[in-house]
């Protein structure tokens, strides 16, 4: 059975028209409202041409940012990142590129930290301000702060540490070892590290170094956990002060979100600030022009559209 030539031609034209429409209307075919709408552009999206020409625009001058920040990574997301050596000697920064933090530590130990040199950290921007270390290994351990190297791995939970002492203390969590005993007479409590024992010793003395930071409170405690429990009391008081205002606004039938309050103590609370930010965000979204909504409103108000709607009495 042969297909007529005009049928094939019409079929080709139909597919051609559909393909053209699927690519989107041209400028002449766009509705008037759509032609006036500017295409959306994300101001935070990366555009190579924008950043390359940014220095040529007068009001987009490069920001004065210190490039010698830790860590100075050159790689992309995922995997080991390339890092730069920022060791400074006689005003010259090394800038040697290493593939990872371990390679950077090896480079520093073999090239910059020698037995003949003084054990001083010359990393760009180091806050030690050229204070000397007593031994080379102490300087090597300090350099892990800048390089980010953590060579000591826990074989139980795979956590990594920069110092072997920290790994040793961490392993006591898994073993249950508590070698530090309270030295107070009659107290038999044991601790995994000396810092926890030091905090505990305040219980046996009148010294209370942890004080409440809330105004007009002045309470002091011997242990930070007691201070945290006390701080929650203040937080619950703040919430109870805000709850009557919330109930009053919800019962009024108004659903007024931004009801002003005369209590100055509640004006700058975190809850009020968060609620005010949500209010501004909601108004900004609602006031934003929506051309698609305008298109559907125009379509539904068109008399020709209602001619195709079924009448209720026709069923």
From Swiss-Prot:
Its main location: nucleus. A zinc finger (C2H2-type) spans 83-112, 124-146, 152-174, 180-204, 210-234. InterPro entries: GLI-like, Znf-C2H2_ZIC1-5/GLI1-3-like, Znf_C2H2_sf, Znf_C2H2_type. The keyword Zinc applies. Disruption phenotype: RNAi-mediated knockdown causes many hermaphrodite progeny to be vulval-less and so unable to lay eggs. Few or none of the Pn.p cells remain unfused in hermaphrodites or males. In some conditions, despite being present in their normal position at hatching, P cells fail to migrate into the ventral cord during the larval L1 stage. Residues 251-270 have a biased composition (Polar residues). Interacts with TCF transcription factor pop-1; the interaction is direct and facilitates transcriptional activation; transcription may be repressed by beta-catenin/sys-1. Transcription factor. Modulates expression of target genes by binding to regulatory elements. Required for normal cell division timing and cell positioning in anterior lineages, acting in a cell-autonomous manner. Required for development, fusion and fate of cells of the ventral epidermis, the Pn.p cells, during larval development; acts in concert with homeobox genes lin-39 and mab-5. Required for the specification of the AIY interneuron. This is Zinc finger transcription factor ref-2. The gene is ref-2.
């Amino acid at each position: 059975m042969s297909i007529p030539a005009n049928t094939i031609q019409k079929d080709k034209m139909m597919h051609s028209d559909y393909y053209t429409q699927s690519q989107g209307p041209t400028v002449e075919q766009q509705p008037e409202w759509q032609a006036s709408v500017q295409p959306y552009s994300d101001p935070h999206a990366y555009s190579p041409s924008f950043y390359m020409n940014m220095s040529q625009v007068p009001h987009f001058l490069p920001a004065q940012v210190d490039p010698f920040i830790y860590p100075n990574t050159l790689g992309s997301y995922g995997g080991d990142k390339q890092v730069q050596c920022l060791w400074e000697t006689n005003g010259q920064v090394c800038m040697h590129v290493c593939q990872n933090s371990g390679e950077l530590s090896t480079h520093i130990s073999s090239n910059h930290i020698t037995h003949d040199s003084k054990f001083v950290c010359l990393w760009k921007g180091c806050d030690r301000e050229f204070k000397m270390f007593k031994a080379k290994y102490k300087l090597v351990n300090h350099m892990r702060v800048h390089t980010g190297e953590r060579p000591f791995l826990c074989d139980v939970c795979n956590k990594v540490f920069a110092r072997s002492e920290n790994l040793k203390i961490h392993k006591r969590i898994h073993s249950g070892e508590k070698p530090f005993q309270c030295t107070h007479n009659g107290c038999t409590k044991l601790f995994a590290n000396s810092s926890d024992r030091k905090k505990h010793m305040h219980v046996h003395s009148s010294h209370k170094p942890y004080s409440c930071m809330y105004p007009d409170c002045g309470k002091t405690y011997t242990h930070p956990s007691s201070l945290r429990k006390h701080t929650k009391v203040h937080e619950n008081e703040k919430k109870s002060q805000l709850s009557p205002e919330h109930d009053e606004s919800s019962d009024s039938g108004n659903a007024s979100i931004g009801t002003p309050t005369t209590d100055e103590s509640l004006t700058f609370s975190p809850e009020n600030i968060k609620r005010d930010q949500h209010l501004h965000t909601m108004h900004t979204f609602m006031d934003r022009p929506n051309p698609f909504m305008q298109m559907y409103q125009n379509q539904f108000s068109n008399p020709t559209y209602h001619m195709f709607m079924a009448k209720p009495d026709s069923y």
